[in-house]
Amino acid sequence: YHYVETAQGYSVAGWKMPKRWVFDFYDLLDLLCEQQDWRRIKGIFHTNQGWKAFNFNPEQFNYQDVEEGIDNRVELIVQNERDWMGFESALFACRIEQ
């Protein structure tokens, strides 16, 4: 499931993915950290290092271990239009085949 909304000069996009999907933690962290012009990135992922919650804002990059989630999900709030399909392809490339 994927959504994109634009309001008040910001673009918001989010993805919900099956709980059974497992992501490579370092590939995912690299992808999230290389994003540009974002206001907030928030997500929870089943990674090869356990379940992780990410909460990035301009003041802090924070991630931590969390209890198992109901699904994998991420939401990005950015200042400019974005190639969301490109981001989605890169996100799905972080997935580890089980």
Predicted regions and their residues:
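C-terminal accessory "lid"/substrate-recognition subdomains
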Residues: 1-72, 80-85, 89-98
